[in-house]
């Protein structure tokens, strides 16, 4: 039926067939307005924030570094790493198993967070640490003779650190895939203050078990303040003839520092490479 008179055939045809809706259109299948309601928005925001916070927490504080090369530069001179000492290679280097978060994160008491004990389990899973700012006498390596007090320095460091938790402040990585770091440890039987935090490098210098690191390149102390502190500790031991300085007082001409000994024997400062 054509009404009004001026209406076209096309218009009349369109009016005779009502408009249909495409039920296959996703826009018609979902009620998008539901996503803007507070009862939906708030739980979604809380869940998203929680997931992002957990990811950030794990990435910044709970991520475990298997070896020194895995440590990101963001840690250098800014962050510390907590770990358990698994072996002592020489008088100034050792290896730790990184335990991020420590006991609060379950290390030592949660069944699946235990430090391995066998060499096979520890292989490629420990961080090789070179104590910053100190140079200990060398042990016998690769057929070369040991330096006086090399054995004593190694035995002292082993007894002081092995199987203990230490905190290392990483300064950089060296050419031997080790991290050069200032090392701190707490010991229950530390007289006169139990659990006092001790600077391991400083303690070695005070006891005459090491000298200040004297290489022309690569020396790292963690700042001028630490360097002055270490040189003062060395002076203390030297003035009293402690440890390796006994030989210095007896015969200065024949005495060799760890650096001079390495130069004379051609011994590289690489430790023993134990895992």
Curated annotation (Swiss-Prot):
Topology within the bilayer: Single-pass membrane protein
UniProt keyword annotation of Hydrolase present: yes
Catalytic residues (positions): 130, 138, 178
SMART domains: SNc
Record bears the keyword rRNA-binding: no
TM annotation in the entry: 41-57
Main location: mitochondrion
Gene Ontology cellular component terms for the protein in this record: membrane; mitochondrion
UniProt keyword list: Calcium, Endonuclease, Hydrolase, Membrane, Metal-binding, Mitochondrion, Nuclease, Transmembrane, Transmembrane helix
InterPro entries the UniProt entry points to: SNase_OB-fold_sf, Staphylococal_nuclease_OB-fold
Family label: Belongs to the LCL3 family.
PANTHER family: EBNA2 BINDING PROTEIN P100, SERINE_THREONINE-PROTEIN KINASE 31
The name this protein goes by in its record: Probable endonuclease lcl3
